[in-house]
Amino acid sequence: MKRNILTAFAATSLIFSSTQAFALINFSAGIPFSHSFSGNWYDGSAVESDGVSGMFIQVGVPIFPGVGMDSYKTKLKDSTAELATTIYNLYYLLPIPVINLTLGVGAGSTELQCAACSSAFEKGSATQWYASFGMPIIPLFDLHLSYRSVSSKIKEKSGTNEHDLSGNVMGLGIGFNF
């Protein structure tokens, strides 16, 4: 009987000491490492990424939704243009012991940036949903992998052609809990 009680106490201590329920505030920062496009240019040709750089940040408190911002630029393959995306997020860190699962939605803008882009393309809107899976490395820090599904369309100023620049962004980050 004593052994069962001690085992249950030890297991409970390990599980609950690594949850984020004890934290007063959480802060997370990450970087995108992959951006793949599912949309096409208006003529049907594929949009391809040649690398992505930027950041993701988010701040929250337990039980309540948190806020965040994504800001990144994606270099387009065989082009001098970059796709600049800025999205503001609302997320919720699910209270699951041992792992940190975050679900969120966001809205913002996207635009093509190059020498002639501002005169040729309008600024487009962007929306996303995302999920982040984190594993605590020590009780107040975690490493997380995120997946973002972004919907984005940009119109040409000279006509009705609309480019679908939707896609998926993968990121890697670290979370701190105070």
Question: Positions of the model-derived regions?
Answer:
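Cleavable N-terminal export/targeting peptides
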Residues: 1-26
